[in-house]
Amino acid sequence: MDTIIHNTTNRSTDTPHVNITCNITEPLSAIRTTEAVINTFIIFVGGPLNAIVLITQLLTNRVLGYSTPTIYMTNLYSTNFLTLTVLPFIVLSNQWLLPASVASCKFLSVIYYSSCTVGFATVALIAADRYRVLHKRTYARQSYRSTYIILLLTWFAGLIFSMPAAVYTTVVIHNGTNGQSSNGHATCVLYFIADEVYTVLLSWKVLLTLVWGAAPVIMMTWFYAFFYSTVQRASQKQRSRTLTFVSVLLISFVALQTPYVSIMIFNSYATAAWPMDCEHLTLRRTIGTLSRLVPHLHCLINPILYALLGHDFLQRMRQCFRGQLLDRRAFLRSQQNQRATAETNLAAGNNSQSVATSLDTSSKNCNQHAKRSVSFNFPSGTWKGGQKTASNDTSTKIPHRLSQSHHNLSGV
């Protein structure tokens, strides 16, 4: 929602009335229209997409059980869906199309800022959890209790972080230049008076820059730098499959976050250094409009990156559409039948292969006895083959942990 800085020195208890003395420039009007169009697209595409992914993840958790990655993924999809649920009300309010009370504005503001904060924090937690999997030689899952405690603390921190929004969000009635009230121009805004700009507003913008911008970038970069060095020691097939997935994930995140962090840093500087005339107030609103889009774009691409591009999630989604995940017992029974059939086919194939191998060995032995020849060479695959097998045994730990990390990144 918009941030309004009013050139007064005290806060009135009544509903603030703001005179429209600063005309909306053409660039600001174009940016606000573009913001409304992009947000509408995100709502109609990202909302159903997050709902489908969240329902699929919840049903998969119910059927196959929970794990630390799936708990984090479920929390990420929930926060994104919650953000996109309140976004239509904020968009309509910004366009002066939805009158609201002060209580409803404060409620929507708290939900919006807390869900966005928890969403960014969950992305960092997922990166930290994947680092923990690759860094430890033996992968021991942390207890679900500690995972839930971490998420509860994250939500608590998100609610505390959104307290300035609860305090300073209000309804502002926009008046014309003649002081007369304009019908339908009552909007939900973050309202700050002049004395609060260099204390409350500046401090909050700096915190937004750190929590929403810098911290997730640092966590993601730190994890994937270690991830890249680990992938170099994996097999070529595993390396290619995992690097493709991780490269798309990291490039998409950094491509959004790098401009966002730059805009937020510049916005904090503008709040502290620029005067409060009409020109600079309009520029502040323009910068704020640009920075508001990035969290919404994350809500759109997160289900694509973490779910639809993840391992085995599309199969789970098809099973969800067919209703196979609704009955847990029937699903597990069908999985057991498929596993038993596969094991039977594998055993039959191994038996036929062993028979063919024994026949081939017998024929070779007969030929050797017939030739009466003696060889002092090592049999094929004894010393050299054993050395290669031992080397492979010691090097399978990294691909195994890498496979776990790639599988758990998708949360399924």
UniProtKB/Swiss-Prot annotation:
Segments traversing the membrane = 36-56, 81-101, 107-127, 148-168, 207-227, 245-265, 293-313
What InterPro entries does the entry give? CCR1-9-like, GPCR_Rhodpsn, GPCR_Rhodpsn_7TM
Region (Disordered), start-end ranges: 377-412
Q: What molecular function terms (GO) are annotated for this protein?
A: G protein-coupled receptor activity
Keywords noted in UniProt: Disulfide bond, G-protein coupled receptor, Glycoprotein, Host cell membrane, Host cytoplasm, Host membrane, Host-virus interaction, Inhibition of host chemokines by virus, Membrane, Receptor, Transducer, Transmembrane, Transmembrane helix, Viral immunoevasion, Virion
Q: Partners and quaternary state?
A: Heterodimerizes with US28.
State the protein's purpose.
G-protein-coupled receptor (vGPCR) that constitutively activates multiple oncogenic signaling pathways including STAT3, AP-1, phospholipase C, NF-kappa-B or cAMP-responsive element (CRE) pathways. Plays an important role in viral reactivation from latency through activation of host CREB1, facilitating its recruitment to the viral major immediate early (MIE) genes. In turn, expression of the MIE-driven genes such as UL123 are de-repressed. Also facilitates virus dissemination via the extracellular and cell-to-cell route.
The protein, known as: G-protein coupled receptor homolog UL33
